[in-house]
Amino acid sequence: MKSTDPIKIAVLPGDGIGIEVTEATLPVFEVLDVPVILNYGDIGWEFWKKEGAAIPSRTWQLIASSDTVLLGAITSKPQREAKQELSNALKKSNPYYVSPVIQLRQGLDLFANVRPCFSIDDQSKPFNFCIIRENSEGLYCGFDYFPLPKAIHSLLAESQHWQTIPADEASCALRLQSKSGLTRLFDFAFKHAMQTGMPRVTLADKPNVLRESGEFTRKIFESTAQRYPKIQADILNVDAVALWLIKSPEKFGVIVAENMFGDILSDVGAGVMGGLGLAPSANIGDKGSYFEPVHGSGPRIRKNCANPSAMFLTISMLLNHFGYPDRAKKIVNAVMQVIKEKRFITYDLGGHATTTDMANAVIEHCARLNASCLSKDFNPTPKENLIESDTMPNLLQQLINCNSAEISDALDACGIEGGLLSIKPLSQGMKIIGPAYTIQYLPREKKGTAFHNAANYIDKVPKHSVIVIDNNGQIDCTVWGDLLTHTALRNNIMGTVVHGAVRDVESIRSTNYPVFCTGIYMCSGKNRVYKANEQCPLSINGVTINPGDIIFADDNGVLVIPNDRLQEVVNKTIAIRLTEERIKTAIASGSTLEQAREDYCYEQPWLGINKKRES
């Protein structure tokens, strides 16, 4: 596939919690703007019972036409139980059950199982290691016998111990390993270490017991290691590796092992991470791949209680594999942040959130982090014309085409009261976006007989600011008029918001200078009120405005966006705008309003999620 092509993903939700975590996490592709084509397929226990095939032929056809596979989870049972659950008609055909994951690994020749393990919650002793397990050979290669085949009887006859045991009372499994299979595995492990910056590759085996096959493996490992002189290579007994993974996981880099040893160590690694609910995996071959969380189908886990983190991290691995490392990292960071905050975590992490709750929290964090084109820090003194220039602060650029209704919904989603009640535009069609420069007026105890030049502050206001004046809502005297308007225009001030009255209305309107106010009155405030404070916090109708907070105003009214919450509000505003545009399009195409709202998650429009599945 070309780098610009969408990733064609065969999505196989599977069994049990696999269905739930898949459904809950897939919106992250859209939130992160990843070009994907998702096509759903059938796999798992239900299809074994109904059709006698855990992976139906139609699913293999789907996989063949896809770039990769995303698997939720599958239920797998021993051969006897598998056959017992078939219908009588299927029992007559005597199908042979093979776990779907084994079928995928062998059918697609996915020789490397990759299990990253890293510290998520506790950073006091950080670790980052990866277990790479051989998938196609070793003790899981499929040569597993009971009763023993006659070809093995002669081998038993050579052992004095086994001569005394009847052949029909023994079973065996062969640990078959090939030079080519081990060579490609070890080469993959060292390359992975180089790509991820891990300085050490450890072969976990049991050469002190499996002397012949262990020596065979050792020679191939050491030969491969010579091609990677910058990587430390060592061989340890697998039981020692398990011990030291628990005691000192930070000492390891890449751990490579044959099939069964790697399987066991992978679950040890998941435990070190914090549980199977956090453990992702990838299965990689020369020409294919599939990705799945480690946790399995979780038949004992209650509905909507499973931890979706492993699936999010699995999707992160998929994105990294297909050339989207930045977006992959955003998912990892979002998962870590949600777990750190502990507000929306599932029961296995000590919380009470549902699968959906935690997934939505991770997706929302991803939406915030996906502001790669947005500035990380906002400078309240922008450099160019706010509305017109392409060089205005990037965060504010995102709001140019938005309206106050959309931003108000975003503020509500953030739990922020931002609307300045009763303040309206002096002229229709005006819009303001910019940082607040605050002025506070207070009434004089006694009306003066002379003007006191209370508005000379305007000479110090930085260009592109929005002047916010609190005159306590008074409409019996004004604090803004013609002279201030012309000075503001000369100084490139973006607009004025007055909690009180203004005058010289005709002149102001003729200049197209944006003014928003409570009312209109002709009497000056110069001898009735005085400037008490400048660049101070204001409180207008219960809303606090701090210097540098963002003011957004249009025909609907005036909003205040706290500067420290700007990025969050921008992300949610854009998502809300996207959601409402989708709903409008759906209605224009014949959908009912109720259906369109359901399809596009209108109960949480700030996520910007398309909940419709593509058929």
UniProtKB/Swiss-Prot annotation:
Highest taxon in the source lineage: Bacteria
SMART domains in alphabetical order: Iso_dh
Keyword line: NADP, Oxidoreductase
MF term (GO), any: magnesium ion binding
Pfam families according to UniProt: Iso_dh, RraA-like
Cross-referenced Gene3D superfamilies: 1.20.5.3070, Isopropylmalate Dehydrogenase, Ribonuclease E inhibitor RraA/RraA-like
Annotated GO biological process: isocitrate metabolic process; tricarboxylic acid cycle
InterPro entries: IsoCit/isopropylmalate_DH_CS, IsoPropMal-DH-like_dom, RraA/RraA-like, RraA/RraA-like_sf
PANTHER family: DECARBOXYLATING DEHYDROGENASES-ISOCITRATE, ISOPROPYLMALATE, TARTRATE (PTHR11835), ISOCITRATE DEHYDROGENASE [NAD] SUBUNIT ALPHA, MITOCHONDRIAL (PTHR11835:SF34)
Family: Belongs to the isocitrate and isopropylmalate dehydrogenases family.
Protein name as catalogued: Protein DlpA
